[in-house]
């Protein structure tokens, strides 16, 4: 869940789902297809911004990496519009004194943070959407963070001043084609991304879900189509009849990865973190998912 947030209006306290709080009876304990050995499998995670992979799925990524699974990550943007927590780095934040660009320097800095987080998680295969191998017809594209604002109900709304090069402003079809190209290259057995609501509603998270959905439509019955696709569970819904998976992952690796994302996340103690909005959240080693496909 990225802290990307250029808020032009007063809003209610931000609202986030609590991870791993409700586990359905009969929930799976594995994201892999039945009888798949972890050391022979590949999982592809598709996220919107640097830090999302850690806060939403970090314990799961570390869990499978430790089991010998090939874990891949595609990140859609570099998080150029994120808020910055450390005072000594706030010149990187768009709109703050000292910022002389449109978030490019922050994006570069966050790429470095992402590299540190992935090392903590034990993940060594990472690409950006729009860059090889995730390109449509081999044409590289840089997708920018769309940003967001907090609405009066504590839920995200679209950023009214997002750029034309932002992820949500660009057409969906080439983005989906780029993901298809990456899937052909990686050949994952399992794909993990957001559910339709984007987890907590960030416009870029919702777009990433739409990209994955369209990519699966394009793939159809192609032999490279992932056997299972999972969506990160947001608020638990007892009426949701889809298969749930609950992964009891590595909370220690997740916390260390969070510490790498210092512009976005403050780790308060072993069990608690917060974004720039100072809403305390649990560092959960349990991460739940619902089957999408």
Residue ranges, per PLM feature:
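Active-site rim/loop-helix segments in enzyme catalytic domains that contact anionic ligands
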Residues: 2-186, 213-222
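Short, flexible loop segments at boundaries between secondary-structure elements
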Residues: 218-240
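Histidine-centered active-site/metal-ligand motif
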Residues: 47-49, 202-205, 261
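Active-site environment of divalent metal-dependent phosphoester hydrolases
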Residues: 53-56, 80-83, 196-203, 266
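Short, well-ordered beta-to-alpha junction loops that form the rim of enzyme active sites
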Residues: 129-132, 193-197, 203, 233-234
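Active-site rim elements
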Residues: 104, 196-199, 240-245
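C-terminal regulatory/interaction regions
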Residues: 2-5, 10-36, 210-213, 217, ...
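Short, Asp-centered acidic motifs that coordinate Mg2+ and/or phosphate
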Residues: 190
